[in-house]
A protein has these predicted regions:
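Flavin-dependent oxidoreductase catalytic cores
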Residues: 2-77
Length: 78
């Protein structure tokens, strides 16, 4: 599954919401999932609702998404 930004992460902090986890988990049967755009720095965030991965809260949020996909046998790349 190719990447497509959904804008469903928390717009204040970039942490994936339960809706993000549900969205990707529903697609876990795809051969391979490439996530939406992810900012690696606070300054690099292009727009509200996009995902981020530059602090521990965000890492914990993405870990929940990844574990949910792996539980369904899926593969994901952030």
């Amino acid at each position: 599954m190719s990447s497509m930004t959904r804008g469903r992460c928390d717009p204040k902090n970039g942490v994936p919401t339960d809706l993000v986890k549900e969205y990707y988990t529903q697609r876990a049967g795809a051969a391979f999932i490439l996530t939406e755009s992810i900012s690696w720095t606070q300054r690099g965030n292009g727009f509200p609702g996009s995902g981020s991965l530059y602090n521990s809260d965000q890492a914990v949020g993405w870990k929940k998404v990844v574990e949910s996909i792996h539980a369904k046998g899926g593969k994901i790349f952030i």
